[in-house]
Amino acid sequence: MISLKDKVIIVTGASSGIGLASARQFGSEGAKVVMAARSYDRMLELAPSVAPPERVLCVRCDVTVEDDCKSLIAATVERFGRIDILVNNAGVSMRAMFKDLDLKVLHTLMDVNFWGTVQCTKYALPYLLEAHGSVVGVISIAGYAALPARTGYSASKFAIRGFLDTLRIEHLKDGLNVLVFAPGYTASNVRKAALTADGTPQGETPLKEGNLMSAEVCAKRLSRALRRRRSKRILTLLGRMTVRAHNVFPSLLDRWTYRYIARESGSPFK
């Protein structure tokens, strides 16, 4: 098991949720943390809770903009001289039936979730290879098994998994660790910010957030997976059972998933 002390770690989507909790977790373990998000002022306010000033860098970055991703990597190398770990966490969800959906919503989800991961990874890769480091894609159980009313979300998470699984094989002999990290349901703002059929945030969550895994627990699991240089991590018993059922009893899982979503508050099936 490796130590994260003095490792240079970039976290996208670091202004809230799993990204912020992960930045704090890495900082508590002595890492040098680069926080990347669109909410620059918010990151500046949060940075003291992550690490001392000399060990944290905030970079305004919209991962849908290729030049922003390129600048993020350049700023990191200029400040710390290397990159050991890239955590592709920035993401957006949705909740609407495909038949009702404005296609711009799918484009947004693919731009943020998939292309954001691809673009940041592309520019960080030479430094990660040099450091024999790790690249992480924070996906979802929806990246293993379909989730109704989240066509674009599932598609983007499946795409990230396919991209990173392929990248792992391409660099199997180069010392690069590629981790596909699937948290399952985690308490965060992602459901309130989820896009509806016309692209506006739904502003509420259909789940009881207090009953879900906390972002802090999720961040601890991510840290452990990185220190162990894992290639795959699926969190929660429900998450692991869902993935197993998808592989063994796909038709049964389809029916179970339908019933599960139909019971949600404000279910799109109602």
What are these regions (language model features)?
Residues M97-F98, D102-H107:
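Substrate-binding pocket helix/loop in short-chain dehydrogenase/reductase
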Residues R60-S71, L103:
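The beta1-alpha1 cofactor-binding region of Rossmann-like NAD(H)/NADP(H)-dependent oxidoreductases
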Residues V8, S15-S16:
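Conserved glycine-rich cofactor-binding loop
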Residues T121, S156:
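Active-site helix of classical SDR
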Residues S140:
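Residue(s) in the substrate-gating loop at a strand-loop-helix junction
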Residues E29-L46:
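Conserved glycine-rich Rossmann-like NAD(P)H-binding loop of the short-chain dehydrogenase/reductase
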Residues K173-L237:
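SDR active-site lid
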